[in-house]
Amino acid sequence: MSHANEVPTWSGNREVGALSAGEGFLTVLASWARAFPGAPGHVSEARRFVAHLLVGSPFRDDAIVVLSELFTNAVLHTDSGKTGGLVTVQVTRWRQGVRIAVTDQGSLSQPVIRDPGASGEPPDCGRGLYLAAQLAGHLAWHDDPSGRTIAAAFGKVAPEHTHLRSCGISNPVGGVR
């Protein structure tokens, strides 16, 4: 039986230690990563994965919503949604926050955050990143040869830990203007 204040254990990639940035250190309680097939039916499995890891976290509900949006975008808009595609989810916890990162297999298009209230925007798309930007304290992404990673940080992240706030990624977004 799991207690609400315990950090769940998982047999995947777990790292415990400190991340350094400049002069400061941030103690990471745990970090997990898991790859899922890039198909719509696996979004719920990814949500359960994150929900289990964030039991007792005040960021759990928002993190699950953001994960769902990012995973769905990866399946619908990137090569991860093609036959045999994968989506990797990474969850990192520290005492005052959580980071959710979703890595897909890339695409030629770039992520766009659309304000659903703006006139002229398609009514049925573009809301996922807007919602993620509203719920997360920080949202950022980058591309590399393996694909695209979009990461959302929740909670308190000290200014000297920009690698967690912007998740070491270009295009940081702290909300939509």
Where does each model-flagged region fall?
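Conserved short strand/loop->alpha-helix "switch" segment adjacent to the catalytic nucleotide/phosphoryl-transfer site
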Residues: 45-68, 121
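Conserved ATP-binding N-box helix of the HATPase_c
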Residues: 58-85
